[in-house]
Amino acid sequence: MFRMLSSSFEDDPFFSESILAHRENMRQMMRSFTEPFGRDLLSISDGRGRVHNRRGHNDGEDSLTHTDVSSLQTVDQMVSNMRNYMQKLERNFGQLSVDPNGHSFCSSSVMTYSKIGDEPPKVFQASTQTRRAPGGIKETRKAMRDSDSGLEKMAIGHHIHDRAHVIKKSKNKKTGDEEVNQEFINMNESDAHAFDEEWQSEVLKYKPGRHNLENTRMRSVGHENPGSRELKRREKPQQSPAIEHGRRSDVLGDKLHIKGSSVKSNKK
């Protein structure tokens, strides 16, 4: 079912590594689930929905195997149809022109849930949001949570035309590892503070309210450097649907490793 993810998630470096790992875990789970019913399903079906009888199986076992294969084929067809629909919907949205003098908001999210026996449930959640305002102003927010690996991460980016300052934070609840990284696009790290002030100034022109772009605050990360202060300013007070699961996420802690990198765009 995880194949239902749109290409916007699969092709995004922020999500891709976690998606591939989760997909492999799902495949292993499905293989272990089908073994008690039909062992190797590929050896049972001829690929056209017909099931061959095998020696050593009685009629009851063959009937169960046929039912299992038919059910899986039905589910696979449903998933395939849904994925085609989502891809078509995504193409239609991509064709919509964005008015540079207007405001826009776009949001996508996905969630998978699985549970076998007495094992804890495995939940994978991912979401992405983009807000735009006149003057090339944009805010991007991405979040991901994988209960199986224990990884939770979030990225918030502020953009003015081709310049951007992106802050990424992550925490692995199983290992305790925490990290905050900063990415500077078409700018140097020394320009970050001036850029953030410019971004806030541009946003304030549009009489910000509760749900506007600059309504963000970050919890303290234990270091009063420019990156940490900007994290505080950017955090959203509401719970993030991809990180939160009935409570406020504790992605940030008291001791984090801060890293920064500059990226030059090839756009002219």
UniProtKB/Swiss-Prot annotation:
The gene is MLF1. Residues 50-125 are annotated as: Interaction with COPS3. GO terms for biological process: DNA-templated transcription; myeloid progenitor cell differentiation; regulation of cell cycle G1/S phase transition. One of its GO terms (cellular component) is ciliary basal body. Residues 226-237, 244-257 have a biased composition (Basic and acidic residues). Belongs to the MLF family. This is Myeloid leukemia factor 1. Involved in lineage commitment of primary hemopoietic progenitors by restricting erythroid formation and enhancing myeloid formation. Interferes with erythropoietin-induced erythroid terminal differentiation by preventing cells from exiting the cell cycle through suppression of CDKN1B/p27Kip1 levels. Suppresses COP1 activity via CSN3 which activates p53 and induces cell cycle arrest. Binds DNA and affects the expression of a number of genes so may function as a transcription factor in the nucleus. GO terms for molecular function: DNA binding. InterPro entries: Myeloid_leukemia_factor. Phosphorylation is required for binding to YWHAZ. The modification Phosphoserine is found at S6, S8, S32. Residues 208-268 are annotated as: Disordered. It is found in: Cytoplasm; Nucleus; Cell projection, Cilium; Cytoplasm, Cytoskeleton, Cilium basal body. Interacts with CENPU. Also interacts with NRBP1/MADM, YWHAZ/14-3-3-zeta and HNRPUL2/MANP. NRBP1 recruits a serine kinase which phosphorylates both itself and MLF1. Phosphorylated MLF1 then binds to YWHAZ and is retained in the cytoplasm. Retained in the nucleus by binding to HNRPUL2. Binds to COPS3/CSN3 which is required for suppression of COP1 and activation of p53. The lineage of its organism: Eukaryota, Metazoa, Chordata, Craniata, Vertebrata. Keywords: Cell cycle, Cell projection, Cytoplasm, Cytoskeleton, Developmental protein, Differentiation, DNA-binding, Nucleus, Phosphoprotein. Pfam families: Mlf1IP (PF10248). It comes from Pongo abelii (Sumatran orangutan).
